[in-house]
Swiss-Prot record:
Residues 209-229 are annotated as: Basic motif. Ubiquitinated by CDC34 and UBE2B in order to be degraded by the proteasome. Acetylated at Lys-29 by EP300, the acetylation enhances the interaction with CEBPB, DNA-binding and transactivation activity. Signal peptide: none annotated. The keyword Protease does not apply. GO terms for molecular function: chromatin binding; DNA-binding transcription activator activity, RNA polymerase II-specific; DNA-binding transcription factor activity; heat shock protein binding; kinase binding; RNA polymerase II transcription regulatory region sequence-specific DNA binding; sequence-specific DNA binding; transcription cis-regulatory region binding. Belongs to the bZIP family. It comes from Rattus norvegicus (Rat). Residues 1-21 are annotated as: Required for protein stabilization induced by IL1B. The modification N6-acetyllysine is found at K29. The keyword Nucleus applies. GO terms for biological process: cerebellar granule cell precursor proliferation; circadian rhythm; fat cell differentiation; multicellular organism growth; negative regulation of apoptotic process; negative regulation of astrocyte differentiation; negative regulation of cell cycle G2/M phase transition; negative regulation of cell population proliferation. InterPro entries: bZIP, bZIP_sf. This is Cyclic AMP-dependent transcription factor ATF-5.
Length: 281
């Protein structure tokens, strides 16, 4: 309510002339509002029949108390000290110069452009080196065969023995003829040692695959022929059984047909005999 009263007083002061403002209350001479009381003090004053702050209850209804309520207008005064009359307020800070800011921004952009233009261009990245080739196993080479040299023939010894025998003559028995050494038989060449390849050659592998495929085709064709032969034999046996059943049914039908014909002939004879009897009677 105090705020409404203050606004009303300010409005009246602004609207009324200066001569009619003598009855207004001086804000500075109003007494200060009492200090706020604690909850126990308010409760004690209410129990004793008085108002908080030692005041006495006002006469009249409860809606007219705000008209006589004391208001502290010091809380509405500005916190800053009022300026003396004739002094100007401090100048507000000047707004930033837009042209100066634009020029600074343009300079920064030019510096950045010069920096990027002066920077050396990086060479294009070199392509990655090709991966090393996979290690391949060398093909096994056959081991070389070593042929032992043949021992030299002893032709020279044979000639020496013949020469000594001719020099000695037939009557000289003091010299003994040297035995002719026997030539050793030639050594047989060693068999070549060849170890098997660690893996089959591609040609043999391809041939094995073809042979395996051919065997599979032969076995599949054989199974197909056997299955068809079994199915044909089963169908043939069923056909023979049906033919035998058909012959049996045909014989029974023929016998029934003969019986029917016999009955017909019998009925015809009975009819003829009866007609003759009626004529004679």
């Amino acid at each position: 309510m105090s705020l409404l009263a203050t606004l009303g007083l300010e409005l009246d002061r602004a609207l009324l002339p200066a001569s009619g403002l003598g009855w207004l209350v001086d804000y500075g001479k109003l007494p200060l509002a009492p200090a706020p009381l604690g909850p126990y003090e308010v409760l004690g004053g209410a129990l004793e029949g008085g108002l908080p702050g030692g005041g006495e209850p006002l006469a009249g209804d409860g809606f007219s108390d705000w008209m006589t309520e004391r208001v502290d207008f010091t809380a509405l005064l500005p916190l800053e000290a009022p300026l003396p009359p004739g002094t100007l307020p401090p100048p507000s800070p000047a707004p930033p110069d837009l042209e100066a800011m634009a020029s600074l921004l343009k300079k920064e952009l030019e510096q950045m452009e010069d920096f990027f233009l002066d920077a050396p261009l990086l060479p294009p990245p070199s392509p990655p080196p090709p991966p090393p080739p996979a290690p391949s196993l060398p093909l096994p080479l056959p081991l070389p065969t070593f042929d032992l040299p043949q021992p030299p023939t002893l032709d020279t010894l044979d000639l020496l023995a013949v020469y000594c025998r001719s020099e000695a003559g037939p009557g000289d028995s003091g010299l003994t003829t040297l035995p002719v050494p026997q030539q050793p038989p030639p050594l047989a060449p060693l068999p070549s040692l060849s170890r098997p390849a660690p893996y089959p050659s591609p040609a043999s592998t391809r041939g094995d695959r073809k042979q395996k495929k051919r065997d599979q085709n032969k076995s599949a064709a054989l199974r197909y022929r056997q299955r068809k032969r079994a199915e044909g034999e089963a169908l043939e046996g069923e056909c023979q059984g049906l033919e035998a059943r058909n012959r049996e049914l045909r014989e029974r039908a023929e016998s029934v047909e003969r019986e029917i014909q016999y009955v017909k002939d019998l009925l015809i004879e009975v009819y003829k005999a009866r007609s003759q009897r009626t004529r004679s009677a």
